[in-house]
Amino acid sequence: METRNNIVNTLASNLRFLRINTQVEEPITGKVKFMSQRQLAELMGSTCTQQVSKFELGTNIMSSYQTYKISKIFDISIDKLFDAELVKSVYKKTIKQNIYAE
């Protein structure tokens, strides 16, 4: 049986893996860059990049709502977020940044 720390560390590793393998296309310039912690925080509805950093380090635990938002942002099932094999998979995604999003 997995311990709480194993689960938190798996989720943290998977979040970082998904973020660094996701690109964001800027709407005006069309430039494509890898997703930053700031961009992920904004997509999650927050302005606090420190929170994303703590999630990726496993020092803070995501709420069920935050986990749900992550699954929607990266278009991945919630159970896959807790799969230790995810970091061994091939995952690439491009998101078009919406300058009109609230």
PLM feature segments, named:
Residues 63-80:
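DNA major-groove recognition helix of helix-turn-helix/homeodomain DNA-binding modules
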Residues 2-5, 72, 82-102:
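Short, charged recognition helix plus adjacent turn
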Residues 50-54, 65, 83:
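Base-recognition residues in the alpha-helical recognition helix of bacterial helix-turn-helix
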Residues 24-54:
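Short alpha-helical DNA-recognition segment
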